[in-house]
């Protein structure tokens, strides 16, 4: 449906902020705002995750592929010695 609506300045700013936050068009931001308000849905809460410093790596991960290849070679030698 097409219609003309006159928005108060503060309401326009709310819709434009929603557009920027969600990277959507004016139409989608306005429709979503009306749906959220009409359905009584609360605004999504801000999600954050705490971080922790785990220190210096105990294993040099730059050599991870070489380490995996060495382990595979050792396993093959072990199997050959066992006769499997």
Swiss-Prot record:
Keywords, alphabetical: Toxin-antitoxin system
Source superkingdom: Bacteria
Primary role: Probable antitoxin component of a type II toxin-antitoxin (TA) system. Its putative cognate toxin is VapC37.
UniProt-recorded name of the protein: Putative antitoxin VapB37
